[in-house]
Curated annotation (Swiss-Prot):
Full protein name: Uncharacterized HTH-type transcriptional regulator
NCBIfam families per the UniProt record, alphabetical: TF_Staph_AryK
Pfam families assigned to the protein according to its UniProt record, in alphabetical order: HTH_18
Gene3D superfamilies named in the record: Glycosidases, Glycosyl hydrolase domain, family 39, Homeodomain-like
SMART domains (alphabetical): HTH_ARAC (SM00342)
Record-linked InterPro entries: Glycoside_hydrolase_SF, Homeodomain-like_sf, HTH-like, HTH_AraC, Tscrpt_reg_AraC-type_HTH
PANTHER family: ARAC-FAMILY TRANSCRIPTIONAL REGULATOR (PTHR43280), HTH-TYPE TRANSCRIPTIONAL ACTIVATOR RHAS (PTHR43280:SF28)
Length: 745
């Protein structure tokens, strides 16, 4: 058996130099180590990485309590993976950034830790991490191709050595190798002795013995089998050659290493496996969010307990910009879809008074008998009435007499238009306070007694507290904005600011609740414009999946906020923004061509939760009853969105969650499992793949919209007591599992 690579932990120094066949990369786990080559000594401290290349002479000198680990790749294995592997030369330089060194160290620490643990997934995980390590070295560690990086001065001798390293287990002869390089046997023998100081046969036997040592150390195979698979004609020939080179018989060599097996580390010294794993964990944590690791396990046990906690669903307020946008059939369809999927029932529109003032002050005489300046407005009102939507209108710059007069004309007309139908739920929203609002609200309430007044609450509003108190009897809600991006100076890229920004929404919510309490203001809150960290550019769209972050914010806000606002779609949103920074203030539900953004599905999944909370922790909530419940699991990792632009560093962090729901009633249950993550339901990844310089045709649009949807799995399961689920969680993903017991027959 020939091993492709070795994974070792060493606590003892080497007494002599060795020449490496293959490639070695490692780091100092603890203490200090001196790494010697032919000409230099490199002092390595804890965490420092070292690389030893093919044919290099090397020796380790460990200081007191020093521990190193390394991965040694056999040349035959490398040759199968890379062209000209024997010429590949890696060297750590200043070009190897700290971030990339952390990544290398992290992969190695995971690899060694996995090897020590030796569970049923270890071999598969080792192979994955080994490939990941090599890929990372190829991408991030500077390399050159040196045809003569070894001590050999003759390229043809070098070729022979490489050939022997790759084919040592075959029947090789001086005649065959001389023909391989185009020399006579005598000339090759002479050059070999001049370059290496040993003859051809001695070099061949030494190479075979070094590989046989690995089999003696790491396998339980019979000595005869080891002899034959390493190129010897018989066990007797192998034994003679082995004793000549090592001064031991193969049996004696194996007997001196009774504690070492293929699945254990050779040099444990005074350190047990658990101690080594704890030491390695310090390095694994450094880049934990950016490394894919199928052995990242999380075991969660849930037993339902009686609780008085309740989960509150939100009233969703959808911004459409100008009221006339409600005449667009595509926008109407989007609103109705939202209404169906998560009970959207309120629309926020911009102020129509400037339009009415312009019509009333037109240079020609308005004739009510032949024209209607409210025609389009009436059509919009009819749509809202037909589908039970309420209308909230933003009043802006309302302090002039002309504005107040136009407002009264508008309100009077709306009251007349809806009087013959069911009542329209009508609200007014103001972002600034002025005394003229008192006159306007009195007129409004006379015609719409059930109408509401929304006041934007911030520090400017607080400075007008006396007027706010006068209006308080008419106020239904206080409205506020909270954009995490406002807490960050993107030009500085300060990670501390990004950490603070991750809590910005909930912190501002708590600040306003405290402000209301101090001034004895008791009204529910609406979070209208809000966003998590995105970066101040459209480039990050789709690169940083945020579903889990958004669901985390919704759960934190559910007991503090009554309403949540969204823009209906990208086109409406961006058309009302002055710049990219302004665009970051809010989130839209639809992209172009009716494509649903992940935030849409986040709202949809959140709406599937019921009010009774059975269990909750930092990453999970269960609602419902013990026979009909919903499990929401999510991952929320807040990090600088610009890191998502580095494709190599933005690897998926995959966690396998083993979830047990205990003490359930025996019976047959139906399971519906929704998965929303970067691979399931993320619009922009598919969008970019199917978008051309000329846009998207209908087939592409239909396909992208059809495929951009959370994954759904449905199945039945017969349970006696415990529901066991295995859930693959990708960074910032969301899983909603609906569990319903069938009635007993």
């Amino acid at each position: 058996m020939q091993r492709d690579y070795l994974i070792r932990v060493e606590t003892e120094s080497m007494s002599d130099f060795k020449r490496l066949n293959g490639l070695m990369i490692g780091f100092v786990i603890k203490g200090e180590a001196h790494i010697y080559d032919e000409n230099n000594m490199t002092q390595c401290n804890s965490g420092d990485i070292f690389i030893i290349n093919h044919r290099d002479l090397y020796r380790f000198q460990l200081q007191q309590d020093g521990i190193i680990c390394y991965i040694q790749f056999q040349m035959k294995y490398l040759a199968d993976k890379f062209d000209d592997a024997h010429c590949l030369y890696f060297h750590l330089t200043d070009a190897t950034t700290t971030k990339n060194k952390h990544q290398l160290r992290n992969i190695m620490a995971r690899l060694v830790s996995t090897h020590i643990r030796h569970n049923e997934l270890s071999k598969l995980t080792e192979q994955q991490l080994v490939i990941q390590l090599l890929m990372h070295m190829i991408h991030y560690v500077p390399r050159t191709y040196h045809s003569n990086q070894s001590i050999l001065n003759d390229d043809k001798v070098n070729q022979v050595c490489d050939y022997i390293e790759l084919h040592f287990h075959e029947d090789l002869s001086l005649s065959e190798l001389s023909e391989y390089v185009g020399w006579s046997e005598s000339h090759l023998s002479k050059k070999f002795a001049e370059s290496l100081g040993v003859g051809f046969q001695h070099f061949l036997n030494t190479t075979r013995i070094e590989h046989a040592k690995l089999d003696l150390t790491y396998t339980d195979e019979m000595i005869t089998d080891i002899a034959l698979q390493n190129g010897f004609s018989s066990a007797a020939s192998f034994a003679r050659t082995f004793k000549h080179i090592t001064h031991q018989t193969p049996k004696q060599y194996r007997g001196d290493r009774p504690a070492v097996t293929e699945n254990q580390q050779s040099a444990q010294h005074d350190y047990h496996d658990r101690e080594l794993i704890l030491l390695l964990n310090d390095y694994i944590e450094e880049m934990n969010h950016f490394i894919e690791d199928i052995e990242m396990m999380n075991y969660k046990e849930i037993t339902f307990q009686p609780t008085n906690q309740q989960l509150n669903q939100f009233n969703h307020i959808i911004q459409v910009g100008y009221l006339r946008n409600l005449l667009n059939t595509q926008y109407q369809s989007q609103l109705l879809t939202c209404h169906h999927d998560f009970q959207v029932n309120e629309v926020l529109a911009y102020d129509v008074m400037p339009y009415i003032m312009k019509k009333l002050n037109a240079p020609f005489t308005y004739d009510a008998e032949i024209s209607n300046i409210f025609y389009d407005i009436d059509l919009c009102l009819d749509f809202l009435l037909d589908h039970n939507f309420s209308l909230t209108m933003h009043l802006d710059q309302y302090d002039s007499r002309d504005y107040i007069d136009a407002f009264k004309v508008f309100i009077h007309h709306v009251a007349l238009h809806v009087s013959h139908r069911k009542d329209l739920k009508f609200n007014l929203y103001v972002t600034t306070l002025h005394t003229s609002l008192i006159e306007m609200i009195d007129y409004f309430k006379a015609l719409f007694p059930n109408g509401g007044l929304y006041i934007h609450l911030d520090q400017a509003t607080e400075r007008q507290l006396p007027l706010l108190k006068r209006l308080e009897p008419h106020i239904d809600h206080f409205v506020f904005d909270a954009n995490s991006n406002n807490a960050v100076d993107f030009n500085k890229m300060n990670d501390d600011e990004f950490k603070t920004a991750s809590q910005m929404i909930i912190n501002k919510t708590n600040y306003l609740i405290d402000l209301m309490h101090r001034h004895h203001l008791k009204r529910p809150l609406i979070l209208l414009n809000w966003n998590t960290l995105t970066g101040d550019t459209f480039i990050t769209n789709g690169e940083c999946f945020r579903g889990g972050i958004i669901i985390e914010q919704l759960l934190k806000l559910s007991s503090k906020v009554e309403g949540i606002g969204y823009w209906l779609n990208y086109d409406l949103h961006v058309s009302h923004c002055r710049n990219e920074r302004d665009y970051m203030n809010s989130i839209e539900l639809f992209h172009q061509y009716n494509g649903k953004r992940p935030v849409y599905f986040t709202a949809l999944l959140f709406n599937k939760l019921t009010s009774n909370i059975l269990y909750s922790d930092d990453t999970c909530i269960v609602t419902g009853t013990d026979s009909n419940f919903q499990i929401l699991l999510y991952d929320a990792k807040h990090f600088n969105p610009y890191l998502a632009l580095d494709n190599q560093m933005n690897m998926r962090a995959t966690e396998m969650i083993h979830l047990n729901i205990n003490a359930l009633e025996e019976g047959m249950y139906k399971i519906k499992h929704f998965t929303l993550d970067k691979e399931n339901g993320a619009l922009f990844n598919l969008w970019r793949k199917h978008h051309t310089i000329h846009g998207m045709d209908k087939d592409s649009i239909d396909y992208v919209n059809r495929m951009s949807f959370p994954k759904l799995e449905v199945y039945d399961i017969d349970m006696t007591d415990t529901l066991a689920l295995n859930i693959k969680m990708i960074t910032n993903g969301i899983h909603l599992i609906e569990v319903k017991r069938y009635p007993s027959s």
